């Protein structure tokens, strides 16, 4: 019996052809899918490369920018310059001290010195300009020194020295004449509209000469600041490290003097500084190792690294171990020019804390003249009230009065102690601001802070020089004990 055999039906020609066509179609589809997959893979690869570049390359640029900032801020705080520091004053005509009293070089002479030595540039940050007596419409002989300074400035362009002036908007045509003369001589002048930018004024008073020498202090560009107003400042010679740091503040004013200027936030890195209260510059001043930095106000004008002026003052008060001596024209724990009125107790609180918690000896020598605000004496009386034989809180307040003849009394905005400094057992602070809230919140100011306590055994430090000036004035016949509010007007008149 034959075995059962399964037979397959033989496909027809058409059926075979269909199978071939179907096979080729499948292959075509496969090739199409393959090509699509390759294209998709390429696109994904490209997208990955773009993403990688964003993750790797762009942060690299960011890191480069950040590194630039860090280089500026981590710059070596050691300065190799051998700087010469000179404490300078203007003593008003008719104000005479005892024969053995401390006397410092004049601001007029120091200004003349750095002007005559200028080789390439003079940059001046200023509140206003009245170096001639045209603003008073008089022929006051004591204006001669101011007129000499203005003439030296007008001659600088002829010597190939560039002059830049940053100034607050003039408040009267009479205060614009010096500015016009400077422009006519070839000086570059920019009006910094801080009233618009910060609701304050450009109250700073400093010079930078050849990026090597500088002056900073209380004296305005005013003939009275040389002969009719008591002023104090510092002139530093051969000190490019500090001069260049102060110049950064000037450059900030300069850029804000452009038309339609706005406040940068943050400031570009080239305005930053590595020198501040935490990392002061290590520099030799008068052959003495010193820690120095420059503070600034208001905060919106301070670039990265710059200590705000208020923070500097508070830090110095808190750092004092034995005494805090303050000599300023105005002192008030308020915002004097705000509407509505605002209480502003920051400095006041730290003074009280120093007296109460650390038994620090605090003395305030405040100016008293015809433009003094009556409210100031209310707050001064509050501070003075802390001192008594029972409390043993060591705080004293005196007022300083510059004498005036009948002729001198007719000179407007003169015959006043315009100083703006503080000295402790550790630090010397020389500033440009009055001590009320407005000057630290809205108004542009700056200060030089010097600490030489590391130089053990050094005689005649800058701190000692400033202390000697304070004690001379405190013990002089022009200083009067502050007792009651009712008597302050009588005490302000000689």
From Swiss-Prot:
Residues 198-225, 413-439 form the PLD phosphodiesterase domain. It is an enzyme of class 3 (hydrolase). Coiled coil: none annotated. Disulfide bonds: none annotated. CDD domains: PLDc_vPLD3_1 (cd09144). The keyword Membrane applies. GO terms for molecular function: single-stranded DNA 5'-3' DNA exonuclease activity. It is found in: Endoplasmic reticulum membrane; Lysosome lumen; Early endosome membrane; Late endosome membrane. Belongs to the phospholipase D family. This is 5'-3' exonuclease PLD3.
